[in-house]
Design a protein with these regions (language model features):
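Bacterial Sec-dependent N-terminal signal peptides
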Residues: 8-10, 14-15, 19-58
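N-terminal catalytic scaffold of extracellular/periplasmic and nuclease hydrolases
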Residues: 58-246
Length: 247
């Protein structure tokens, strides 16, 4: 099967049949509990990274990167203890991802604060660099850009997507495609979304589609066509519009 056919098959089978159906069901309230949602996908999913690469025996076909909001060792162990209690036993019932063959831990302080925030933490998770609280995709000098693993994947010919339960220009998802000295620069972050050129974005809209500093500037919705993107609102609209567009 050709690479293009593999990509088409993946988009159809995964995005349409699994992820997006679950994604929209959760926010419509059809999945009522966080626990129920986690069993099918992840607890409090904020971000997801998907990369499709040319396949060979030494290379992963898909890569998923999940970030749970504020989720650390205590939250994971607490959940496992809770699941154990539900089964009436002493000890834990392991979660799926804690059984993976490899695991590690990371420090959580930022470059300037003992307690990080979503922007600095997102930048560290995306790029491997600590930065100042509030900064996205730049070092603590607020000028030097750093690039995410998603950008590296895109540069190597992979297809990349970002999905979040918050707005697409929020700090954590933005850390994978944007460069901003302040996380509140939502319009500029939205422009970076287009300019980075990933293949798929999903979230709860833009926080600031219009540039408050320059009302004459094009709003972010109108830029979609210019950059070759199609905007879909809701699962049914996505199904209607996803047959032809590539982004």
């Amino acid at each position: 099967m050709k690479e293009s056919e593999n990509v088409s098959l993946f988009i159809t089978s995964f995005y349409e049949k699994k992820f997006l159906k679950l994604y929209f069901s959760y926010f419509r309230g059809k999945i009522n509990s966080t626990q129920g949602f986690m069993k099918k996908l992840s607890i409090t999913i904020l971000f997801f990274l998907l990369a499709f690469c040319q396949i060979n025996a030494q290379q992963a076909k898909y890569v998923f990167y999940f970030i749970g909001d504020g989720m650390g060792v205590n939250q994971v162990q607490g959940t496992e203890l809770y699941l154990g209690e539900l089964e009436g036993k002493i000890g834990i019932t392991p979660l799926q991802f804690t059984q993976f063959p490899y695991a590690t831990v990371a420090t959580t302080f930022s470059a300037t604060n003992g307690v990080t925030d979503s922007a600095a933490a997102g930048t560290a998770l995306a790029t491997g660099n600590k930065t100042k609280n509030g900064a996205i995709g730049v070092l603590k000098d607020l000028q030097t850009p750093v690039y995410s693993v998603a950008t590296w994947a895109k540069e190597r010919g992979c297809r990349v997507g970002v999905a979040t339960s918050v707005s697409v220009d929020h700090a954590t998802p933005a850390a994978f495609y944007a460069h901003a000295s302040g996380r509140g620069s939502y319009y500029e972050i939205g422009k970076d979304l287009y300019e980075t050129g990933f293949d798929f974005y999903a979230g709860s809209d833009f926080l600031q589609p219009q540039d408050k500093k320059n009302p004459q500037a094009a709003n972010l919705y109108s830029l979609a066509d210019q950059y070759g993107y199609t905007i879909a609102r809701g699962y049914k609209d996505y199904l209607r519009k996803s047959k032809k567009p590539t982004r």
